């Protein structure tokens, strides 16, 4: 069974057909590159996979579980969108780092927000925060950015910002990691 199964995804914006009957399978550990000209729908496909856009047709499954089926309204519940998004990590083309937060804070923020939704958060807030920071520091080290944890995005190069965005996406331990324009700011190291 494929880790990711996309079947018949279509997306229209008014009379513009951006995605037409897109299907793909991705096995665990496999990498897939989607190459196309500007405006060909690559970003729209990623946005549909992450439920930032709603596909008009088709089915999205992760590890055999149906996350979206255009023909099944039960998969359209807004209350389930956040849970569905946790299957995917997305590194945006422009990284979308929060300018008012340090590299470390950018990585821990999503984990903090998720933790706050749990009933045990108030009693264990300090321990949870410490655990999230430790994980973020480990990811920064893996990205070669340990010395940049207290730097703000404007103090980082484009490649460094991208690596912080990758660390942020990895922090939530997604099943699938998606990159929009992954080579746009890589340092030539």
What residue spans do the PLM features occupy?
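Helix-to-loop junction immediately C-terminal to a conserved catalytic motif
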Residues: 50
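ABC ATPase NBD coupling module
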Residues: 67-89, 127-130
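Catalytic Walker B motif of ABC-type/P-loop ATPase nucleotide-binding domains
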Residues: 177-180
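Helix N-cap at the start of a conserved alpha-helix in ABC-type nucleotide-binding domains
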Residues: 188-189
């Amino acid at each position: 069974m494929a880790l990711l199964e996309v079947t018949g995804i279509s997306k229209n914006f008014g009379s513009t057909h951006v995605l037409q009957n897109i299907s793909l399978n991705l096995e665990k550990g496999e990498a897939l590159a989607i190459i196309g000209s500007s405006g060909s729908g690559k970003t729209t496909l990623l946005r549909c996979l992450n439920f930032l856009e709603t596909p008009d047709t088709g089915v999205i499954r992760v590890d055999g579980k149906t996350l979206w089926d255009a023909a099944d309204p039960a998969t359209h519940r807004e209350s389930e969108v956040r849970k569905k998004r946790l299957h995917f990590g997305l590194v945006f083309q422009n990284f979308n780092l929060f300018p008012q937060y340090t590299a470390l804070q950018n990585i821990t923020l999503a984990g903090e927000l998720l933790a706050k939704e749990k009933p045990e958060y108030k009693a264990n807030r300090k321990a949870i925060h410490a655990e999230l920071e430790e994980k973020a520091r480990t990811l920064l080290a893996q990205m070669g950015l340990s010395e940049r944890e207290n730097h703000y995005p404007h103090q980082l190069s484009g490649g460094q910002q991208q690596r912080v965005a990758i660390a942020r996406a990895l922090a939530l331990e997604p099943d699938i990691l998606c990159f929009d324009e992954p080579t746009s700011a890589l340092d030539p190291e």
